[in-house]
A protein has these predicted regions:
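Short C-terminal beta-strand
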Residues: 120, 171-181
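Glycine-rich ATP-binding loops of the HATPase_c
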Residues: 159-166, 174
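Conserved catalytic submotifs in the C-terminal HATPase_c
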Residues: 49-60, 95-97
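Short beta-to-alpha transition helix within the HATPase_c
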Residues: 25-41, 75-78, 93-106, 111-113
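Short conserved segments within the C-terminal catalytic ATPase subdomain
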Residues: 43-53, 86-89
Length: 192
């Protein structure tokens, strides 16, 4: 009897997740990035400036969990700031891209429309940086930072992919690919 109840529970547990997946609201990507950057007020104290380049139009959204995307952006931004020990420029960019089999960057994503959110820094890279930023011992806040593997896994959970590239003496660029959607625009009828 316990096996039947367990199987029955698992089936009921799966059904709501499928319906929630379909009803996931579209997240306007540019708005999300702008609100996220507004919350990064602590960067000025560290000598880090922020540059935004929002190429996506205002109707482009992503079909992923908003909180998960914000967590990914926070993890990638903190990682970038850790590379800029003496200050620098943190850049966030949104672009709508079409991935196909011949895509420039290697991802396991199916062909289709995606939003690429790029987070890059101008700091130098040190070989010990990956280990140093998982926990900052000297930090007054003792922030625990997610590893690059954890960020990649979170991107997969969001239905996307994370591709990072190091550039000698000029920082790192992380490209987060998320499934793109278009928000429906209701026409406004005005009388003249």
């Amino acid at each position: 009897v316990s096996v039947l109840l367990r199987d029955d529970f698992e089936q009921r547990d799966l059904a709501p997740s499928v319906s929630l997946e379909r009803r996931r609201p579209a997240v306007p990507v540019n708005e999300l990035v702008e609100h996220f950057v507004a919350a990064l007020d602590f960067l000025d104290e560290n000598g880090v400036a922020v540059h935004l380049c929002l190429v996506c139009d205002r109707w482009t959204s992503v079909s992923a969990d908003r909180t998960l995307i914000e967590g990914l952006l926070l993890g990638l931004s903190l990682r970038a700031c850790d590379h800029m020990h003496q200050g620098g420029l943190l850049s966030l960019e949104t672009t709508r891209v079409r991935l196909d089999e011949n895509a420039f960057e290697e991802t396991d994503l199916p062909p289709g429309e995606y939003v690429r959110v790029s987070v890059s820094d101008t700091g130098g890279w040190s070989e010990g940086a990956e280990n140093a930023w998982t926990t900052r011992v000297g930090s007054p806040r003792r922030l625990e930072r997610p590893s690059l593997a954890a960020l990649r896994h979170a991107a997969e959970i969001a239905g996307g992919a994370l591709v990072c590239a190091r550039h000698a003496c000029c920082g790192e660029r992380a490209n987060l690919y998320l499934p793109a959607t278009r928000r429906h625009v209701r026409p406004v009828i005005t009388s003249t």
